[in-house]
A protein has these predicted regions:
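Flexible, solvent-exposed loop/hinge segments and secondary-structure transition points
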Residues: 1-158
Length: 158
C-alpha cells in the first residue's frame, strides 16, 4: 500500500484565495475551480463581475489537468501538442461530453511527485489565467513549507 496526499477544502480555499488576490492585483475577473484527483470540484469561486460561463469552463480545465496530468495549454502547443490536427489526440476535446479542455488555464496540482488535483481558471487571457494559477500553486508550496514539494510552474506534464 502506498500513502498519498489528499487535497482538502483548507488547501483548496488557500489556493483559490491566492488566485483571486492575484486576479485583483492584475485587474481581471476570474473564476477558480480546485478539483480533486478525480476531477471533481472541491471548490468553485467566481469573482463579482466574472462571466457566468466561468464556473463550467474553470471546472473543465481543472478536470482535464487533474485527469490527464498535464497543463491544458500543452495539448495545443506547437509543434507537437497531441490535440493539434494530425497528432495522436486530435479531437480529444470532444471526449467526456465536451468537458476536455485543450486551452490555457488548467494546471495539475502536483505534491511530492503525485497529481492530487487540478486548478482551472477562467476569465482572463492566457497570460492572466496562468499568472493566477501559478500564484495558487506557489501559495500551496508556501503553506507546506519544507514538509512537501509542490510543482510550481506553468508547463506541467507527468
Amino acid at each position: 500500500m502506498r500513502q498519498t496526499f489528499k487535497l482538502e477544502r483548507a488547501e483548496a480555499r488557500l489556493m483559490a484565495a491566492a488566485a483571486i488576490t492575484k486576479a485583483e492585483e492584475i485587474k481581471v475577473f476570474e473564476t477558480v475551480c480546485i478539483a480533486d484527483d478525480g476531477g471533481h470540484p472541491i471548490l468553485i469561486e467566481r469573482m463579482d463581475g466574472a462571466r457566468i460561463t466561468g464556473p463550467q469552463i474553470a471546472w473543465n480545465k481543472a478536470f482535464t489537468a487533474a485527469g490527464h496530468k498535464r497543463s491544458t495549454h500543452l495539448f495545443n502547443q506547437t509543434p507537437n501538442g497531441p490535440a493539434l490536427p494530425g497528432n495522436e489526440a486530435f479531437g480529444i476535446q470532444w471526449s467526456f461530453e465536451g468537458r476536455f479542455a485543450v486551452f490555457v488555464g488548467g494546471f495539475p496540482i502536483v505534491v511530492d511527485g503525485e497529481v492530487v488535483g487540478g486548478i482551472g481558471l477562467s476569465g482572463g487571457n492566457g497570460e492572466q489565467d496562468t499568472t493566477c494559477g501559478v500564484a495558487a500553486l506557489k501559495a500551496l508550496q508556501e503553506y507546506f513549507g519544507s514538509k512537501h514539494r509542490v510543482l510550481v510552474q506553468a508547463d506541467i506534464k507527468l
